[in-house]
Amino acid sequence: MENKITKSLVIIGGGPAGLAAAVAAAENGLPAEDILILERDGRLGGILNQCIHNGFGLHTFKEELTGPEYAARFEERAKALHIPYKLGAMVLSISPEKVVTAVSREDGLFTVEAGAVILAMGCRERSRGALNIPGFRPAGVFSAGTAQRLVNMEGYMPGREVVILGSGDIGLIMARRMTLEGAKVHVVAELQPYSGGLKRNIVQCLDDFGIPLKLSHTVTEIHGKDRVTGVTISAVDDKLKPIPGTEEYYSCDTLLLSVGLIPENELTLGAGAPLSRVTNGPVVNESLETGVRGIFACGNVLHVHDLVDYVSEEAAQAGRAAAKYVQGGSKETAEPLSGGIKLEAKGGVRYTVPSIIHPENMPDTLTVRFRVGGIYKNSFISVYFGDQRVQHRKKTVMAPGEMEQVLLKKADLQNIDFDTVTVTVEAE
């Protein structure tokens, strides 16, 4: 017989976003026993458990931590607040009425009727199948995150001679990690004319170890039938098409793919929340509320982040908003994404989070996060209220691999006669 539970707040995912959201909700008046975290893995912490390198926590804790240390701090806070959680619990669906259906070995099939839901499912890696690389399907082709888990958690070495396709942060970090474990990383090839990772990771993970980064290059063939024996990489033109005659062959037994992250939003679609075509995450308002009232989103399920500190900050915002919603404190509009002020991304800005602002519901200062679509040097981030420019901040360098942000003040959005706020990149 199906088990039924009732909770004020259900959080899908027990990673850094889910934990921070749960803690914030409990610290903002929601009784801990009315919160439930559902995590499909066997432990809390999410992706951080396999990120054993340092560099986490500089913004949140003002000190440098490893991934597991950072996760442990939030896990300890959640446990100190006695927030309930279920491990090994796979969520199957979320209805627009906020009924969560899940299954676990311990509880079997069960449903949770929730007052509010926070989506914190994180993201997944883009696979080889999305790349259409010619060749057989030999052993030795891994996503960078899978290789990271094998090396850091399972104690297995994927290979000894490595080529990496893609220069996302996970790929850069795994170039260093594989080198430290004794492998030879021959090259990191990147399709775009710029790296997809943070500048500090390029320096610390590639430059410091003498690993070459070839921009505007991609893998055009994987050699080997049973096991990878080598790969061919080629330069690409400005339309990202391989250029004949530029082929280079590298003998290797392992190819790691770091070719992008995709927010994990199958449950979001099932709940009826619209997704952004740019981020592949849900469209949200100033409270990080999706198009379905009472369902909120935060972390990498919303848009892919560089820093976990920003994930925690965003998740805390969602936790506070969900607690306020459950307790009846939010001033409801007809629909979460209707009315209000529309945020527009123009002139090199690919998207903004949030997309809609209702000034009556926003905090005193709202952080708007975004990414640019190319490399910009000595340019300006500008914010327009209608046709009036109200912010104009110079940035030495902006790149797609590094998230940017602007701050909007609630006081500036009261009694206004415009219905759009535009975030753009300008030359001067």
Q: What does each of the following model-derived ranges do?
A:
Residues L9-R73, R77, R149, P158-I202, ...:
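Beta1-alpha1 glycine-rich phosphate/pyrophosphate-binding loop at the start
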Residues L109-F110, A116-L213, T218-R227, G294-A297, ...:
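Predominantly flavin-linked oxidoreductase catalytic cores and closely associated redox partners
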Residues L119, V141-V151, T254-H305:
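FAD-site-proximal beta/loop scaffold in flavoenzymes
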Residues C298-A345:
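A conserved FAD-binding loop/helix module that cradles the flavin
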Residues I381, L408-E428:
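Short, aromatic- and glycine-rich surface loops/edge beta-strands on solvent-exposed regions
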